[in-house]
Structures are given as C-alpha cells and as structure tokens.
From Swiss-Prot:
Processing and modification events after translation: O-glycosylated with core 1 or possibly core 8 glycans. It is unsure if the O-glycosylation is on Thr-347 or Ser-348.
Region (Subdomain NB (Cys-free)): 178-444
Protein name (database record): Fibulin-2
Disulfide partners: 445-472, 446-479, 459-480, 489-518, 502-519, 521-545, 522-552, 535-553, 608-620, 616-629, 631-644, 683-693, 689-702, 704-717, 723-736, 730-745, 751-762, 768-781, 775-790, 796-808, 814-827, 821-836, 843-856, 862-875, 869-884, 886-899, 905-917, 913-926, 928-941, 947-956, 952-965, 967-980, 986-998, 994-1007, 1009-1023, 1029-1042, 1036-1051, 1056-1068
C-alpha cells in the first residue's frame, strides 16, 4: 500500500504515486477504470490506494492548515500542515487554542482566559477582541489615583511620590514649610474630584499666604491664584493671574526673569465666591493696575518685559527654590531680592551689570513682590532703565498639571484675554523701552493670538487691554487667522479623503476658512492618483492648493507619533539645585526621548506647530521630545539639519555670524543659557521663485523641477527640449517627442505612400491641401485616404454646346448635319440627340417594309417568335402566314387545334419497364428502385453491390437492393449512415476521466499531465506534483534555496544586507546601530517566509499572522506593507494590541508570485523596535 497526502475534501481519489517502481507496475496490470466514479473523501488528510483498485480510501481524517495557520501547525508539531481530528495546538504564546473537530473539517480557534491585571493598576485599557491590558500603574490615596513616577504636593506642606511600580504614596515634608502635616484631608481646599489635581483658586491663595508665614502682605499678588498644588515632576499650567501691587516708594533691586514657556497647556477649574467679594476684588485690582501703569510710565521701566505672557514650549524639569541664597542676603541687611518660582524647568542665575540677576528659564513664572524688610531705608530711588519688576512666591506654590485632555495640535500656552476686570486676565504688555525687541514682542503676541484661536475658534472678538501697540495687535490678528486657516485646511483635506462634499463651512463667520479650497485641491490630487497618472507640481495653482494637491496625489499621511510611556527615575526628597549644575543645561531641548524623564502620553509638544516655518526649510516632522527636518524630492538635507539644497549642487558655506548678534550676547554671563535664534525664512510662500525655493546661507536660491532649466532672471524656469539637446533616453527604432518637463519615446513606424507619421500613428496626407498633386489644368483635386484623384471641371455632354455664359444648350443635329438620316427616314431632334423615323409604307398582313422602306417583304413568324404554336408543336413558315404541326409522341386533340402527349406507360402497362415506367413529353423512361441499376437495354433492373463502391468508412454488409454500414469500437455511425466518427470520450466524461487534461485519440482517449512539474500516477488518470527540490532536479545555485510550489519550483536567495548577520537559513539579525534613530528605524531582525496558495481564494482571507515572541503586557505593534503591494492585493489588520495579520483583500485569479516586505514596529516599555518580514507568496492553480 502506498500512502498519498492530498488536500482535505478531494473529490476524486485518483492520486496514486509513481513510487511503486517499475517492478511493481509491471507485476500489476493496469486496471481499466473507465466510467468508475469514486465517492469524495470528506476531510481526509491521509489516503491510500490499494493495488488494482480504482478508488482510494481514507486512512485518517483531520483538518488542513490554510494560510498563516500553516506555520502555526508546523510549530505545533504537525508535519505538512495536517492536524488529525480531535487534536489541537496553542498559538499567541498559549493565549489561544486551535483545534480540529472530531471528523475533521475547519480549524477553529478559541481565546483562553485572560490573565489577571498586574497589581497597582489604576487604569485598564479594553481593546476589542483582546484581553484587558493595564494602561497605567500608580498609587491610590484617599480615593484618588496618582500615576507611577509622579511627585505631587498635598497641602499644606507635604510632597508625596508614587513609586515606579505603584503601591503606596511615599510622603515627606517640604523644606522650610511649617504647616500641618496630618494625613487628614478635611482641611484641604475644595477639590474637583473628577480631576484630583484641581483645587479652587481662592482657597489656594489663603493657604499660600499662610505658608509664607506672613511674608506676603495684603497688597501682594497671590501666586496661588493661578492653580492648585503642584506636581513636582509633572507638567505646568499657564499663568492665569498677573496682578500688579501698589508701587512702593523705594523699589527693591529686581531680578530679571526670562520665560520660555511650559509644555502643553492644561486647564484648571475655579469656583467663584459671592458676587460682592468678586466686585471688591476687581475694583482693588483695577486700582493696583492703574498704579503700576503710572509708575511704569513715570520711571521708564520695562515693566513686565521679563515675563512674556506666552512663549514657545519646552520640556519640563522639576526645580527647587534657592531659598538659602535669599536668606543669606536678608541676614546681611540687604534688601531681599524677589524670588522667581518656576513650574517647569530648572533655573540658572547669573549676576549681570548693576546687580541685575538673570534667570533664564524654560517655564512660566508667577511673580509676587515681597514686602520691604522692616527697618530698611525708604528713600526714593531713581528707577534704572535696567530694572525689571520681579516678585517671589512661597516654596510650596508649585503649579501642577491638571487632568490630561485629548491631545490636540500643540500650540503655545493658554493666554487669551477675557475682560479687563477679570482677575485672571492676561494682557500682552508691549515693551516700551528702547532696548525692547520687536521680534520677541511679535512672538509673544503671536502666541496669544494662536491661543485665542484655539479657545474661541474666531478672531473678530480679540479683546484689547489698551496697553498693546499696533505691532502686537497686528501679530495677534494674523497669527489667529493663520491658525484658523491651517485648521480649516486640514479639515478640508480629511473631508476630501473621506468623500465628503466640498462646500463652504457653515460656521465661517470670519470668512477666512480654507476648507473648500483645500478640499477641492485635495480632490484634484486624489483623482490624478486614482487614474494612475504621475503626481506633478503645478505652481499655477498657488499656495496652499498646489501643496495640498501634490500631498493628496502622492498619498502622504500625517506623521503619527506613537505615545510612549517612559517611567521617570525615582526621586528622593527635593534637593537644592546649584548654579553649577544648571549652567551646562540647554534652554530648549530638541533631543531624543532620553531627555524627557517623565514622558507620558500628552506631555510631548509638537515643535513644528509651535514654530511653523521657522525650524525647517521644507518639512518639519515632530517626534517624541524632539523633531527632525526633511526635504522635498530632488533636494538633500544640509549639515545644519534644517536647510535643503538641490541635489547635485555643492553645499554653500555657512554665513558668518553677524557682529551685532555677538555684541548682543556679550553682556550675558557665561552661565546664561542663550536662546536659539530663529533663522529668517526667505523661502516663505516660495519666495521669489516660480517653482522651487531653497535657503542656502540665509539667501533664497531658485531651482526648477526635473525637465526645466533656470532662466537668466534666476527665478523663472523654461522647459528643456530633451529631443534637441540629446538628453532623451529613446533607443534605436524610436523617435523623441518633447513635452512640458519631459519627453515621450514613440516606436518608429513605416507608413505607406500617401500617409505620414504623426504622434506615433500614420495619418493621411492631404495632397490637395499641400499642393503635391499632379492634376492638370481644368481638373479639380479631390483627396482620398492614402491618395487623391483628379476630377474634370464642368463641361457639356454630347449633344450640348456651352454658351458664352457657360451654360450648356441643346444642339439641333437635324439642321446642323448635312445628312443625319438614311433615305426613307425623317430626322426628329431630341434634347441632347436626335432620332430617324421611317417614312410611312402600308404592307399586307404577314409582310413588312424593307430596310430601305421601298417595298414589302414576308415576315418569318417562326424565326421571329410571333407565331402561336402550342407546346409540342412545330412551326412551319408560309408566304404571308405559318402552320403548326405535332411532334413525335404527340397527337392532335379532338378539336384538331392543339397537340397532346401520348402516355405510352398507360397504353402498354407492364410491358415497357421491369420496375417503373415514367411518362415524359413525347416519350417515356424506365427507372429502378433504390439498390438497383438500370440494365443496358434501358428496361431491366440489376442489384447493385454498394460495398464494392466502399461507401462505408469502416464495415459494410450488402443486402438485396441495399446495404448496411457498421463501425468498430470507439466509433459511432454518423447521421449519413455511411461515415464512422470517433467518440469523444473526453467531452462525454468532462472532468471525470482525467484530473488534468484528457486527450481524445481515434477510438479511445489518453490522460495527460503538464509537461513540467507533474508526473502521471499509476492509474493513468491523475497527476502528482513533482517535488523538484526533494528530487534534486532543480537548477538553483548553491547560494539559492529551492522552494517547491504546485507544478514548479522557485529559487530564492536569502541574503543579509550590510550590518546584518545570518543566524539561520531564513533569518538575519542586526549587528550594531550607530545612533538611536537607526536603532529605532532599521529592522532588528529580517525573516523570510514562503507561502503557497491556490488561485481563486475567497477574499478577504487571512494569509499570515505576525506578532512579537514572547509578548508582554503593554506591548503594542503597528504593521505596514512597505514594498510589493503596489497593486493593493494585500492589507494589514491588528487582531489585538500585540498580534496582527496580513490578509488578501483582492482576488488573485491567475498564477502569480508576490514579494512583500511587511514591517512591524513594536512599542515596548517606551522603546520602539522594528522587525521586517520578507514574504514570498506564490499563487498556483488547483492541485491535480
């Protein structure tokens, strides 16, 4: 018995292998299985064909592994992807059990029980079709949840830290604070329990004043008015209150503060007290603000220049107040300087000229003036133009992050202006001193305008505090409008991609929405892409339509940066940050993720949106904690990482730094952190260029798209005629035709005479229009396809004459000719001709006039056919008459007028013919019946031997008067009864006799297999695939791997790229990577897979499952087909957070090979790892 593995449900078991050998085949005679129909073997994975039997029997039932299940079955120990009935295996690291039901059939998979969530999980993430996962671990205290790794401030003087693994809060006392340290929270200010970090403003002010121990007096601004107790390691909150105190007679020496801004803005809720108390506070604040304004105007101070209301955002780091330094100065008898409390970044201080302390910062400062020390001198001091108002806060007045909000495009911190009497209002105070920088003012006011657009979605109601100048109001207005336009444009692009109607926005009250324009332009790009045409820029569309059209045509999607959770380093009790430690830190970090110690989803800021058009020349791509620049196609990034130059142009040397910039920073101390100087964007709105603008060395350089050349003016572009300049790539036998920006190659054609080649086709030549005809004068040229003909111009026909007016008139031949008619005829003129009419001559009956009309001659009625002799009569002419006689076999009728036939058969019945007598006109004829032949005498009949004439194509039997034809086996008698036609057994038993191809032969049939890749089995009907790889009949080289497919094989080469080492036959692992980006973006492992499928597979069908091994809680993957799916046959889908599949979404109807590169990115514990699966997919016809 020989076993044969066949797919489950094979309908015909004729697959006996040829492995029986020649000896066995010779011993067992071939069994004739004609007409035998074998029953289908349902769910059979192992078959056997007994010697001499026509039908196979099932040895074992089971399930056949299909698609991506094939690899799971192999890993489960089931050879060749066949699972016996009743057995099972595990996938997805034991989370799913796949089993084959009793009796075989389809494999069904069932998820196992979900694992328990880890302890200290404060937030569970539920994903469809997946187990719940822990989204965040942390601590639970007094009914509130705190994220792991965060330090929070619990009033009045406690700082509590949640460990990285969660659990219980670790609390300690804040240094220098003398409050109540009981754990009871009954005395806490009213907390909004939907946000455990949000407190009411009024109570926070009271507690902050209490914690100061009397340092802050009634006239001071309460720093706590802006928010709740702070999370020491978290984000920051926009400054919500800047209140000016009554200006003292003696000003203390101020501390300069430069704020760069906090991370993404968050919102804090505040409750209000009674209406009476609010009105009193507002009146008091108005008086205080008026006092500050008057004092600023009188003394020429810069006011709050050191505290811009908004500024670019930066990373957040915890800091401490340098209280020891201030205490030392107070003990020495000097007037204490105001302390600057920062809520985001560490501060480095340096003392500049005139004792001014510079405090560069990356956070927002809350300013509170301290009261003068009792006993200090109060003599008036003339304000210095360098003095800057600065205030101090208690150490515990940190501003924490409130609850996270859904991430939006990150913009500048919240600083919109509400009402003049609002105690939480923020005004953009312009710089009034000569040293004030207009550029800084524009940035500050622009940020306020953007924030107003974010909060209010309009730009018409921006309030004016009365202190802004025209520069600030202009910047606010234009930045607000620009943000709304960009937002509406992005919405229009998304609407076009979702197939929405590109209509105007209903809520466009300002009339600045770009929704319809961007939607229409994106629709243009999508249509070009759908038609399969190349995506080319069209500068005539203008900005942003050209950019939007090109982006949608090329299918560019916004970069989606995954949210990365990085647990912070465990922090001990707050310590003092020295100046030396902070001196070397950067003011604005745009580095890698390692510079974000407390990164959680939503903490990252999009620097590309914060500084649009300033960071990169072409494209700015935001990353977690940083950004990087990219260039348009045809350009390369320069060494500075932000500017682009056309490919092929040498890099321009960097412009030397302006001396003015050097002198501007010469006054800053060595430990002051300089701010990055934004480069001017000379290519904004494409600059002066018509096509491509590039910034090189601070100047705009124009270049052109491929196929164009720069003109003499340096900004315009003209088309290059590649056909004339010999820049085309047309081969021999082709001719070049120039187009705008490119060219086309047309195959050279030889046209027949009369045709000329045009646009690759032979077109007719109009010889008449070109004047190349050969028509003589007096002829008119008429063009035809491939030729022409000459048509004579108008002339008169015969019998007409042209008059002087060109008209044709009749000629009277009777008068113009001398003798138009013969003698005896008269001339009669007609139109265009004439006739001759005989002269009248009267003759008797039976006579007519002679040719000359002079005499009468006899009419021969028998020759002219004017006689009236009947059928069977003979005409004899007589002078002036004729006579009718009867023919032989006829006789006259009883009246003697006509002739009738004599019926000889009736006159002598049975005596004239042996078989049949047939009467004819004037005679008779003898005939014989079928099968007989008339004898020579014309009367007798003789039998005919039809078989001698070989009328039958095969066998013949003669009988008396007839014959009978017979056919051999395998033939049948045709309808004519003579011909034997072959019986087409293949047509009668279509699909039953042979599994692949049935060849009809005379009298029988033969089964055939494909010429290559298959061999005939012992039953002579079915075909079996030849495994060339196992038999060694392939032609693959030693460096290639043979892979068998149905009916053929493929030679695959598994080579590892540079910087990779081959760890197995189909796996390559990366050896090293030079930097973080290369480690993140280059694949850590490259694995080759081979998949075989049959054509006509129903879609959608999962063909491959992919995921990390092993998987851990919190793992997240993203799949993407980066190569080989240009025709869209395949797609990717996630089954759960850590498992995805590649599926067939378009039916493959013909044999075809695919080579896919599937990239999987794994997010695990804050890091990203890339894996690459190279899949060789082969679709073949059904098994034979």
């Amino acid at each position: 018995m020989v076993l044969l593995w066949e797919p489950a449900g094979a309908w015909l078991a004729l697959g006996l292998a040829l492995a029986l050998g020649p000896s066995v085949a010779a011993a067992a005679p071939r069994q004739d299985c004609t007409g035998v129909e074998c029953p289908p073997l349902e769910n059979c994975i192992e078959e056997a064909l007994e010697p001499g039997a026509c039908c196979a029997t099932c040895v074992q039932q089971g399930c056949a592994c299909e698609g991506y299940q094939y690899y799971d079955c192999l890993q489960g120990g089931f050879v060749r992807g066949r699972v016996p009935a009743g057995q099972s295996y595990f996938v997805d690291f034991g989370s799913t059990e796949c089993s084959c039901p009793p009796g075989g059939g389809k494999i069904s998979c069932q998820f196992m029980l979900c694992p328990e969530l880890p302890p200290n999980c404060i937030e569970a993430v539920v994903v469809a079709d997946s187990c719940p996962q822990c989204g965040q671990v942390g601590c639970v205290h007094a009914g509130h949840k705190y994220a792991a790794g965060h330090t929070v401030h619990l009033p009045p003087c406690r700082a509590c830290h949640c460990p990285d693994a969660g659990g219980e809060l670790i609390c300690y006392q804040l240094p220098g604070c003398h409050g109540n340290f009981s754990d009871a929270e009954e005395g806490d200010p009213e907390r909004h329990y939907e946000d455990p970090y949000s407190y009411d403003q009024e109570v926070a002010e009271v507690e902050a004043a209490t914690a100061l121990g009397g340092e802050v007096q009634a006239g001071a601004v309460q720093a706590g008015a802006g928010g709740p107790p702070a999370a020491l390691g978290g984000g920051s909150q926009p400054l919500s209150t800047i209140q000016a105190p009554p200006w003292p007679a003696v000003l203390p020496r101020p501390t300069a503060a430069a704020a760069l801004g906090p991370p993404a803005p968050v919102q804090a809720k505040a409750r209000r007290v009674t209406e009476d108390s609010e009105e009193e506070e507002e009146e008091e604040e108005e008086r205080e603000e008026m006092a500050v304004t008057e004092q600023l105007a009188a003394g020429g101070h810069r006011g709050l220049d050191g505290l811009p209301t908004t500024a670019p955002a930066g990373p957040s780091l915890p800091i401490q107040e340098e209280r020891a330094e201030a205490g030392a100065r107070a003990e020495a008898g000097a007037r204490p300087e105001e302390n600057l409390i920062l809520d985001a970044q560490a501060t480095s201080r340096s003392t500049g000229p005139e004792g001014v302390t510079h405090a560069p910062s990356l956070g927002k400062a809350a300013l509170v003036p301290t009261q003068a020390v009792p006993g200090s001198p109060r003599d008036p001091v003339k304000p210095s133009p360098h003095n800057i108002l600065s205030t101090s806060l208690p150490d515990a007045a940190w501003i924490p992050p409130t609850r996270e909000v859904p991430r939006k495009p990150q913009v500048l911190p919240h600083s919109h202006v509400e009402e003049d009497t609002d105690p939480n209002s923020v005004h953009s105070i312009p710089r009034s001193s000569p040293e004030g920088s207009t550029k800084d003012l524009i940035e500050t006011c622009c940020a306020a305008g953007q924030q107003w657009a974010i909060d209010n979605d309009e730009c018409l109601e921006i309030p004016e505090s009365g202190t802004e100048d025209n520069v600030c109001r202009t910047a606010q207005r234009h930045c607000c409008v620009s943000y709304l336009q960009e937002k509406s444009c992005m919405a229009g692009v998304l609407g076009a991609k979702e197939g929405e109607t590109c209509g105007a926005e209903d809520n466009d009250s300002c009339g600045i929405s770009l929704y319809k324009q961007c939607c229409d332009c994106c629709g243009l790009g999508l249509r070009v892409r759908a038609e399969g045409q190349s995506c080319e820029s069209n500068p005539n569309l203008g900005y942003p339509c050209n950019h939007v059209m090109l982006s949608c045509c090329e299918g560019e999607e916004p970069l989606i940066v995954p949210e990365v959770r990085r647990p912070p380093e465990p922090a001990a009790a707050p310590r003092r940050v020295s100046e030396a430690e902070m001196a070397g830190r950067e003011a604005l970090s745009l580095g890698t993720e390692a510079e974000l110690p407390n990164s959680l989803p939503g903490d990252d800021q999009d620097e590309c949106l914060l500084l649009p058009g300033e960071l990169c020349q072409h494209l700015c791509i935001n990353t977690v904690g940083s950004y990087h620049c990219a260039c348009f196609p045809g350009f390369s990034l320069q060494d500075d990482g932000r500017t682009c130059r056309p490919e092929g142009h040498p890099p321009q040397p960097e412009a030397p730094q302006e001396p003015a910039l050097k002198s501007e920073f010469s006054q800053v101390a060595s430990n002051t952190i300089p701010l990055p100087l934004p480069q001017p964007n000379t290519c904004k709105d494409n600059g002066p260029c018509k096509q491509v603008c590039s910034t090189v060395g601070g100047s705009a350089i124009c270049s052109c798209f491929p196929g164009y050349a720069i003109m003499a003016d340096g900004v315009s572009c003209e088309d290059i005629n590649e056909c004339v300049t010999d820049l085309h790539t047309c081969s021999r036998g082709e001719h070049c035709v120039n187009t705008l920006g490119s060219f086309h190659c047309y195959k050279a054609l030889t046209c027949e005479p009369g045709y000329a080649l045009k646009d690759g086709e032979c077109e007719d030549v109009d010889e008449c229009a070109m004047g190349t005809h050969t028509c003589q004068p007096g002829f008119l040229c008429q063009n035809t396809k491939g030729s022409f003909y000459c048509q004579a111009r108008q002339r008169c026909m015969d019998g007409f004459l042209q008059d002087p007016e060109g008209n044709c008139v009749d000629i009277n031949e009777c008068t113009s000719l001398s003798e138009p008619c013969r003698p005896g005829f008269s001339c009669i003129n007609t139109v265009g001709s004439y006739t001759c009419q005989r002269n009248p001559l009267i003759c008797a009956r039976g006579y007519h006039a002679s040719d000359d009309g002079t005499k009468c001659v006899d009419v021969n009625e028998c020759e002219t056919g004017v006689h009236r002799c009947g059928e069977g009569q003979v005409c004899h002419n007589l002078p002036g008459s004729y006579r009718c006689d009867c023919k032989a076999g006829f006789q006259r009728d009883a009246f003697g007028r006509g002739c009738i036939d004599v019926n000889e058969c009736w006159a002598s019945p049975g005596r004239l013919c042996q078989h049949t007598c047939e009467n004819t006109l004037g005679s008779y004829r003898c005939s014989c019946a079928s099968g007989f032949l008339l004898a020579a005498d014309g009367k007798r009949c003789e039998d005919v031997n039809e078989c001698e004439a070989q009328r039958c194509s095969q066998e013949c039997a003669n009988i008396y008067g007839s014959y009978q034809c017979y056919c051999r086996q395998g033939y049948q008698l045709a309808e004519d009864g003579h011909t034997c036609t072959d019986i087409d057994e293949c047509a009668q038993g279509a699909g039953i006799l042979c599994t692949f191809r049935c060849l009809n032969v005379p009298g029988s049939y033969q089964c055939a297999c494909p010429e290559q890749g298959y061999t005939m089995t012992a039953n002579g009907r079915s075909c079996k695939d030849v495994d060339e790889c196992a038999l060694g009949t392939h032609n693959c080289s030693e460096a290639e791997t043979c892979h068998n497919i149905q009916g053929s094989f493929r030679c695959l080469r598994f080579e590892c790229p540079p910087n990779y080492v081959q760890v197995s036959k189909t796996k390559c692992e990366r050896t090293t990577c030079h930097d973080f980006l290369e480690c993140q973006n280059s694949p850590a492992r490259i694995t080759h897979y081979q998949l075989n499928f049959q054509t006509g597979l129903l879609v959608p069908a999962h063909i491959f499952r992919i995921g990390p091994a092993p998987a851990f809680t919190g793992d997240t993957i993203a799949l993407n087909i980066i190569k080989g799916n240009e025709e869209g046959y395949f797609g990717t889908r996630r089954l759960n957070a850590y498992t995805g599949v590649v599926y067939l979404q378009r039916a493959v109807l013909e044999p075809r090979d695919f080579a896919l590169d599937v990239e999987m990115k794994l997010w695990r514990q804050g890091s990203v790892t890339t894996f690459l699966a190279k899949m060789h997919i082969f679709f073949t016809t059904f098994a034979l």
